[in-house]
Every structure is written in structure tokens, then in C-alpha cells.
């Protein structure tokens, strides 16, 4: 599995990492911390055997990736065991999703995951993963006590493979 993800300014990264750490401490589920998952928002998830072609494609089109603003407004869940922060789906995020999808379709063997296609996508930043029912309740309580609407700036986009995580390409914006 491969991912295209965006990353945030230092203040936002610190804030989201704080939520991740508090959720892990409250219930003793260190999955996100142990896996060294940095705060991010995944734009696309896909399968391919053409890793080098994807890297070349992103390098050729790097100028189309620009910084943008995101407003984080809500907390959500993918049941039964994922808790996340959700931004407003603004023009910046929608257009970025569409651009990445359109570019990836130029590579014959790319298969984009059905939940990461434009207009079939839930933008989110995972706070807790593989949470039990009790851990989900505790995680919601942490965010109920600490979360408030905030804005952030996207400062980097990257292409990576998972299991184990390895960044293959990036652009600092």
C-alpha cells in the first residue's frame, strides 16, 4: 500500500501529536506512538508495482503542489476502533484530492482505494487506532475535554509506502 499525505506547520503538528499522546496515555494504547505515525492527512491510498513511475510523476508535477489552509472543526470515528480529527472539506483539499487522483490514473497499474477517490473520501487525521470499546470512550473523553476548532497550514506533501513506513518522495511548500 502506498500513500500520498500532507503534513502541517509545527504548531499544528505539536497540537495533534499532543492529542495522540494524551489518548495513548489515558488508556495505555500506544499504537500510534510505537509506530511513529506523524500527524498527517492522507490524500490518496493506492496499490501499484510501479513505484519508480510514481516518484517520477510527482517529481515532474511538483509545481502543482502548493501550501494551503485547513480548518479542523470536528472529531469523528471509523467504527469500531479509529478516532480522528476532521477538517472542513474546503476547495484546497478537494482540488488536491482531484489533482493527485488525476495524476495517479496516468500510471496503468495504479489502483486507488475506493475510500480515497474524489467525492468518496473522508479527510481526517487519525488520533487513535486499534482502540477497544473502552479505549474509544476514553479517547472521546480526552478530545471532549481538550479539542477546539483551529486552523493549520499545510507545509509538506509526501509519497510513502507502508509496512514498514518509508517516505519515497516529498515536497516542502
Description of each model-found segment:
Residues 46, 75, 88-90:
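Histidine- and/or cysteine-centered catalytic micro-motif in compact active-site loops
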Residues 75-78, 154-168:
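Glycine-rich beta-strand-turn "strand-cap" elements at beta-sheet edges
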Residues 7-9, 73, 88, 155, ...:
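A structural detector for beta-sheet-dominated domains
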Residues 3, 82, 156:
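Short hydrophobic/aromatic beta-strand or adjacent loop that forms the aromatic wall/cage
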Residues 1-69, 92-151, 167-173:
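Basic, often amphipathic N-terminal segments
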Residues 78-81, 119-121:
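Acidic/polar active-site rim loop that often engages polyanionic ligands
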